[in-house]
């Protein structure tokens, strides 16, 4: 093996298979772009993003790790979210939860 080489199995990788998901329509009501990373607790995103927040508690974007979704001012887009795993505790972000989900 060469340093840095990736030896992956053939075929597609199905990320987050079998985990609960929710689809949400999101509108950026602000005057600046908002970018949300793959592992950010969607419930706690920028208040300029308008959507039904209650249904997103405990969810993050269902996209590959290290990537993000950008919402331009005035833009509406539909995103799929996936349930957070692990102990289902959330700390930090905007400080809206700070504990068990």
Swiss-Prot record:
Known catalytic reactions: urea + 2 H2O + H(+) = hydrogencarbonate + 2 NH4(+)
Similarity annotation: Belongs to the urease beta subunit family.
Source taxonomy: Bacteria, Pseudomonadati, Pseudomonadota, Gammaproteobacteria, Oceanospirillales
The name this protein goes by in its record: Urease subunit beta
Pfam families on file: Urease_beta (PF00699)
EC number of the protein: 3.5.1.5
Self-association and partners: Heterotrimer of UreA (gamma), UreB (beta) and UreC (alpha) subunits. Three heterotrimers associate to form the active enzyme.
Keyword Cytoplasm carried by entry: yes
Disulfide bond positions: none
PANTHER family (alphabetical): UREASE
Annotated localization: Cytoplasm
GO MF terms held by the record: urease activity
Any single Gene Ontology cellular-component annotation: urease complex
GTP-binding keyword on record: no
Gene Ontology biological-process entries: urea catabolic process
UniProt keyword terms in alphabetical order: Cytoplasm, Hydrolase
Pathways per UniProt: Nitrogen metabolism; urea degradation; CO(2) and NH(3) from urea (urease route): step 1/1
Organism: Hahella chejuensis (strain KCTC 2396)
């Amino acid at each position: 093996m060469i340093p840095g080489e990736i030896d992956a199995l053939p075929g597609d990788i199905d990320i987050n298979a079998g985990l609960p998901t929710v689809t949400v329509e999101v509108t950026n009501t602000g005057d600046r772009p908002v970018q949300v990373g793959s592992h950010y607790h969607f419930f706690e995103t920028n208040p300029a993003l308008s959507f039904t927040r209650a249904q997103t508690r405990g969810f993050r974007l269902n996209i590959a790790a290290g990537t993000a979704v950008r919402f331009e001012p005035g833009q509406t887009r539909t995103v799929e979210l996936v349930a957070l795993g692990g102990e289902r505790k959330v700390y930090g972000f905007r400080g809206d939860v700070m504990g068990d989900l």
